[in-house]
């Protein structure tokens, strides 16, 4: 995102209305539980949260043949995700099991690739890409595709998601999404929204207004708590996250303003692993072509985010 786009955001000239995804309340996932699961497999314990049944998805032999031997022998596709970002990735009702459409997508990719399972381990968001190729095979964790990230990893597009503001019910702090200057806004560390907020703040100062006080956190759930509690004016996050949270937050949080800055998100893979990249790209395209990706997203009310082409390192506008 450029400064000119930041200025347009403040004026809402760049606003684009998109459908809002909504499912269950992610505020039941507390930050201490999310943190404590780091480095442990959270995808096998029982939970009552809805998930997509991937058992009907077949193995595609031509794609399975592309999977690197190390991954084949292990039999699992290891995903790293920040499990506090519903509906994409979050902990289920048992506070241990990773749930969400990204978790199910990883399992679906594993099925197509002829593997036994796709497992998801919680990791704090900024640590995922550096761990690709060692701790994790893939990072499916709402990674907005940017030129900077494409320098760090291969990214395969699969959904298109915008950004939105969330405020405490009734907007008691009178937050104006068209003029966030001088406000305190919570963002998740390392996200596209953190970058956007910083550029918005720079534009505020350039326009002679007060800067935005940007409060980054590793866990989106911590931010939501502070917004509801009145410590922050707003949170700025993926539109699917805001929609999911506000719709079933018990009336404690609401979206304000339009959805802006729609951008593709991608599966991250180690930049040097061309073989796995090719296998995952073809597996994702298979899920798209056969309706599985859209069905998975529909389980979480996010079917409108589905893309139809699994593009490797697509051009970015930032």
Regions found by a protein language model. Give the residues of each.
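Ligand-binding clefts/hinges and TM-proximal coupling segments of bilobed small-molecule sensing domains
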Residues: 50-67, 195-214, 285-318
